[in-house]
From Swiss-Prot:
Phenotype of the disrupted gene, per the record: Viable with no gross coordination or gravitaxis defects. Males are sterile with complete absence of mature spermatozoa, while female fertility is unaffected. In developing spermatids, axonemes fail to elongate normally and sperm individualization is disrupted. Tubulin glycylation of spermatid axonemes is abnormal. Hearing is moderately impaired.
GO biological process: detection of mechanical stimulus involved in sensory perception of sound; motile cilium assembly; sperm axoneme assembly; sperm individualization; spermatogenesis
Family under the similarity heading: Belongs to the CFAP97 family.
Protein name: Protein hemingway
């Protein structure tokens, strides 16, 4: 433009007149705005001047009058401070997020806090800033066309901004915990960055957001990194993100996306993942392991109390528990009226064999078998020597089982053997048979006494081929621990056993099977029933049944078409026949009438 003015007088004259007009208009508007803005913004000036030691209003006026066009804009940026983005309101924001929520979400908000409120550079339609910016751009063009006065002024302003940024950093280093100063410094640094951007013209407007964001995050990261070292030195000052009163929480949440692992995750997790103490780990182990009521007693007696006597109160409590358990089982039989309850018996047998094998592993079986006739005190003494209290529990539970069977419970439907029958059978076993080495006399009464589900066996020798080996005929007593857990078993328990055997009498069925017939008659009837049942299972179905079913399927639609002739003797069938005929006649008449109506010409 200036080069063209050198060649032709007309162009230079046109340019000079344009320059004079534009300068006169701009100067008039500048003077109006200059008088309006300081009057409106005196209280906010006082606030900002109190908070930061930057340029005063008089310095800005002098700089503007000296020829710097950006000084007035910088004053306007400082004056028009939106209340919604001020540091006072940010300190009052209630952050209702716990540490876990902050760690999960990591504060991923789509709109950062800077975008929610209009920033200094946003141009509102009809606002003073839009006019100011247009005027400043016009002034930039005029200054470029004229001479290079403003270059020196711009350099001076850049120096001022660098000095301001240095002052901001010094303030942050001096007072790291002051929230208001940090917020105001961030806003001042942001505004100075905006001014340096606006010097570059229209290119800055295109890349406005791209250049804004790194500066803001840089300021925020400085505050975050300077806030972090105190928590490392002092463990007490760990700050929870949900603590609204702490300054650290507000400062570290300066911008979304700037939260690092150090700010959000590190310290709360350090508090949570403290090493377990010995007591805590011990309690955890005790919770994981299934409770076995005998183990703590054995550990105490073996390790800590080698010479002391066992706790008699605990022994009596265990005996009482077993008596109650046997009573419960017998009551369940009585309530069911002799119905099969095989699950309870299987659990009892599993528990019994597990206890026996555990005692065998400890090598105490011989001493237990030798103490069959010992009293309760001798068994208690053996307990003090490290033998688990198996024998005494079994003896007491056996006595409780016998007494509850005989005296406590009436037996209207249950055919369990009485106490006298058990004593007689025990005498027979002592006389004739030798007991197996691993069975006590009062533990199951030997392998000859076969316990069946209550009321299920009938005393008949039906299945001689199902005889089991000798060691599987165990008596299931109620001496199982109340908290027996079969998950802890390391071995497979085989509790299946034959209901009857062909050489031993099933003493469960000493009572009358049926009061209409004698026991030999009942046995004969059962034998005949078994023979008939085998015949019925072996006979194949006849072919006539198959033929009849197939003929029904094939001839079904044909029978519908030609129904069979009704019997004349049935009045109901005759009525149905007459009604059907009447319906057919009615349908025929309707068809005839419709045909006549269609053939007839209809006159309108």
């Amino acid at each position: 433009m200036s080069g063209a003015g050198e060649h032709s007088d007309e162009e230079s004259y046109g340019e000079e007149s344009f320059e004079e007009d534009s300068e006169s208009e701009v100067e008039v508007e500048e003077e109006e705005i200059e008088y309006i803005e300081p009057e409106e913004s005196k209280p906010s000036d006082a606030l900002l001047l109190g908070e930061s030691d930057t340029q005063s209003e008089s310095d800005v006026k002098e700089e503007f009058l000296s020829g710097n066009p950006h000084a007035r804009r910088y004053l306007g940026a400082r004056v028009v401070s939106y209340l919604s983005s001020s540091s006072d309101d940010e300190s009052q924001v209630v952050i209702t997020k716990t540490v876990a929520e902050v760690n999960q979400l990591s504060l991923r908000v789509d709109t950062p806090p800077e975008d929610e409120t209009p920033s200094v550079r946003t141009l509102m339609p009809g606002s003073a800033h839009s006019r100011v910016k247009d005027e400043d751009e016009a002034e930039d063009e005029d200054d470029d066309e004229g001479d290079g006065e403003n270059d020196n002024d711009n350099e001076d302003e850049n120096d001022d901004e660098d000095a301001e940024v240095e002052e901001i950093e010094e303030e942050e280093e001096e007072i790291p915990g002051d929230e208001d100063d940090a917020q105001s410094d961030g806003s001042m640094g942001r505004q100075s960055a905006d001014d340096s951007d606006e010097e570059e013209g229209t290119d800055v407007e295109v890349e406005q957001l791209e250049e804004d964001e790194p500066i803001v995050t840089a300021v925020c990261k400085k505050t975050v990194q300077k806030e972090l070292p105190p928590p490392q030195k002092d463990i007490v000052s760990l700050v929870d993100a949900s603590d609204n009163s702490s300054e650290h929480s507000v400062v570290t949440m300066c911008a979304s996306g700037d939260e690092t692992d150090n700010t959000l995750v590190k310290y709360p997790r350090l508090r949570k993942q403290q090493p377990l103490t010995a007591k805590d780990s011990q309690s955890l182990k005790e919770q994981e392991e299934p409770e076995e009521p005998e183990q703590p007693e054995e550990n105490q007696t073996e390790e800590h109390m080698p010479t002391s006597q066992p706790d008699l109160a605990r022994v009596r409590y265990l005996e009482q528990q077993m008596t109650q358990m046997s009573e419960l089982i017998m009551k369940s039989f009585q309530i069911n009226g002799g119905a099969p309850n095989s699950q309870a018996f299987e659990q009892l047998a599993m528990a019994t064999e597990m206890l026996q094998q555990r005692s065998d592993r400890r090598g105490d079986t011989e001493s237990e078998m030798s103490s069959m006739t010992e009293t309760t005190m001798t068994s208690a003494r053996s307990l003090g020597g490290g033998i688990p209290p198996l024998t005494m529990r079994m003896e007491r539970s056996q006595e409780a089982l016998l007494t509850t069977r005989s005296s406590k419970l009436p037996r209207p439907k249950c055919r369990c053997p009485s106490e006298s029958d058990l004593i007689e059978h025990e005498q027979k076993l002592d006389m004739g048979h030798e007991l197996p080495h691993d069975l006590a006399a009062n533990f199951g009464l030997g392998e000859g006494y076969l316990v069946d589900e209550c009321g299920q066996g009938d005393g008949l020798m039906r299945h001689p081929q199902q005889r089991k080996p000798m060691e599987l005929n165990r008596r299931a007593v109620s001496g199982t621990p109340s908290t027996f857990n079969s998950d802890g078993c390391e071995y497979q328990i085989n509790v299946s056993r034959s209901r009857c055997s062909n050489d031993k009498i099933n003493y469960k069925n000493l009572g009358r099977k049926s009061f209409s017939f004698t026991n030999p008659q009942v046995r004969e009837i059962e034998r005949q029933n078994q023979i008939l049942l085998r015949k019925m299972m072996t006979v194949k179905p006849t072919a006539t049944i198959k033929a009849s079913t197939s003929s029904i399927k094939i001839n079904g639609p044909e029978k519908r078409q030609t129904p069979p002739a009704p019997r004349l003797s049935s009045a109901a069938v005759n009525r149905k026949k007459n009604q059907r005929q009447i319906d057919l006649d009615n349908d025929l008449l309707k068809r005839k009438l419709e045909a006549i109506g269609t053939r007839r010409p209809q006159f309108k």
